[in-house]
Amino acid sequence: MIQSQFKLKGTPSSALLGATLGFFFGVMAISLFGPTSTTLGAAMGLGATELGLLVSVPSLTGSLLRIPFGAMVDSNGGRRGFLFLLAAAVIGLGALSLLFTLYPVETPGSMKGLYPVVLLLGCLAGCGIATFSVGASQSNYWFAKSRQGYASGIYGGLGTTSAGILAFALPLLLHRFGFTAAYYILTGVMLLGLLLYIWLGANPPYFQFLKAGKSADVARDNALACGQELFPKGSAATSLKISARIPQTWMLVLCYFTTFGGFMALTAWFPTFWKKGMGLDPMLAGALTAVFSILAALLRVPGGKLSDRIGGEKVSMAALALLAVAGVLMNIPMGWGGLFFVSLLISVAFGFNNGATMKLVPVYVSEGVGGANGWVGGFGAFGGFVFPPLMGRLVDLSPEHGYGWGFLLFTFFALLVMVINYFGMMRKKH
């Protein structure tokens, strides 16, 4: 009745679909440079550390912009911010495509001096990655508390599969259409994502009623009647302040830094690892990266659902323990087949912990969900920018062992997070 009377746009399912599709296209920028890193590195004369920075640079804006844009959901519902981020990504990709048209990228040394320009445009293209915190907060507001793990799993799980798909598809596009045309195709695909979100994306009911001119109290009552259970406590700044005062927010940030930042980092880094570290051809390197990335993305769904049943804390601890072991195993000589199997163990750990972490945000920070999703999604995803240059630096220090040493970073962080979460969340809860 209320939904019809006020012409409420969307339902929980359609809003989740719109957010998931928008994020799906936006987050593919994680793999923007990974599959082409060898070619771009030769064109610009880059070392391993610089390559690590190149493949991770879309994650810089893709992570940090999550904080303000995620918090703004608590002020305006997020649709406007989502559209802005996708539009910026389209512009960045289009500019990169034009740059690659002007310079013969596949000629070694042809782009010397243009490294800062490519980094800058990579940052702009990475804005689409930042849609995560916007859509995550929208999903939390649209769905009942009992189904937020499911919604977060669908959104984060299906949404992030595009990074793995692109890791496999980009080498195929390069082979079939050439370097420049492949990036123009990516620009068109990102534009499609923008158009789909314009069509399907919708603010949660409370914000729609506010926009229709209802008072905050009336909007809240109407939204309750439509099934919305979570409500913001104030402005974006208020939401950030409230969530920042809750210690568990920062525990979840570190947790997400390790596994979602890790997911972003390895999706970008694995093509380099398989090609330069293991000597595999680009097609196979892309395929192995795609399997790793898509599996990690899809496992967020059962990770979220399992967290609904047994608690996100238990799921997270088990996943982190698996990650700690797998990081050590990546240093054992066993050929690319054995290392690929271990990479799938890392994928399982990432997927389940990412699903569990986002389920825990409304559990521990219900007073400022948008702000918390901004902190967790932003600083958490910042790991995607931090890890690849560190892993590249280790390769520069030891070309023989450095590729394996990089995975010990994940072992260290997994153990650290387990200790912090045990004392900061599990013991306090009981």
Regions found by a protein language model. Give the residues of each.
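C-terminal membrane-cytosol helix-exit motif in multi-pass small-molecule transporters
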Residues: 96, 188-221, 417-425
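Extracytoplasmic gate region of multi-pass secondary transporters
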Residues: 33-38, 246-298
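C-terminal ends and interior cores of transmembrane alpha-helices
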Residues: 87-110, 321-334
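Cytoplasmic helix-loop-helix junction between adjacent transmembrane helices
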Residues: 121-158
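Helix-loop-helix hairpin linking two adjacent transmembrane segments in secondary transporters
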Residues: 155-206
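Juxtamembrane intracellular "pre-TM" segments in multi-pass secondary transporters
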Residues: 1-10, 208-252
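C-terminal transmembrane helical hairpin of 12-TM major facilitator-type secondary transporters
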Residues: 307-357
